Amino acid sequence: MSETRYEIRPIGVIRSELASREAAPRQGYESAPDAWVEVNSAVAEGLEGISVGSEIILITWFHKAHRDILKLHPRRDKSKPVTGVFSTRSPDRPNPLGLHRVMVLEITGNRLRVGPIEAIDGTPVVDIKPVLLQSMDS
């Protein structure tokens, strides 16, 4: 395995009522609450063009994840067969990146209220990308 390393610097943080992994739903569509994304002032200019009603992809770093897990029961359900972590959306993985498709509900300065999102309070945000609605073939 390559020993090349890359540095990722968070651009912000999630502020959520979800205080622990146990409190978080497995997926955003499973009764996840709204949350705030607090974007660092040094990169806040990058929010220009994002508007209320926009769908965005938040890329987060699951800072509470176990990075040494390669196989698991999907959704921690012991009745399901063990499978490789790359065939699941488990936060426990070698590089615990989270992808969250959310709606922008409110913008206040360098803060975005988004939802629904299953990320816990304090989760680092490493990037924000727009949802592209057009086909990649066009």
What are these regions (language model features)?
Residues 1-101, 105-138:
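Glycine-rich, low-complexity intrinsically disordered segments
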